[in-house]
Amino acid sequence: MTEFEQDQYWMQKALEYADKAEQQNEIPVGAVLVKDGELVGAGWNQSICNHDPSAHAEMMAVREAGKKIENYRLIDCTLYVTLEPCPMCAGLLVHSRIKRLVYGAADAKTGSAGSIMNIVKEPKLNHQLEVTSGVMAEQCAEKLSTFFRRRRKEIKEAKRLAKQAAQEE
């Protein structure tokens, strides 16, 4: 299997984990960590469910992988994530010594692997990652867009119902 085919395969797996987040009404981001062609960690956004602002997909996958390989250094691992990491997660990837980051959709608001800043390639830090961006970007971005459209519609409907109930009193 070529690197391109591997990237497609594992990003599809990350999208499946993003579906788990969406089923819990979390922002649909999924991540998988791979070492030597084997899944060693996986996660999806769980910040709302866990009341934990650090429970991003990347964080959950890294925690699981560390336990599985019994090491906090995830050397020679590749992280596949459906959305470009935020500053917190980018820092985590550097500290974890992950070799390679592959992400789908760019994040113009908090993207820290090239969009608004580039923590994962910062030369002042003691580790930099190889980065491949835009893998299955359209599918990843569409999943997020669909989620936020639905969420805005639900919020609008809830406001309408609240206003209607207030008028009936």
Where does each model-flagged region fall?
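Zinc-dependent deaminase
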Residues: M1-A21, L92-E169
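Small-residue (primarily alanine) positions within well-ordered alpha-helices
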Residues: A14, A18-A21, A31, A57, ...
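Short, basic and Ser/Thr-rich N-terminal targeting/leader segments
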Residues: N25-V29, I75
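Short beta-strand scaffold segments in enzyme catalytic cores
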Residues: V29-G37
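Short beta->alpha transition motifs characteristic of CBS
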Residues: V40-S47
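Helix-adjacent hinge/juxtasegments
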Residues: A55, M59, R63-R100
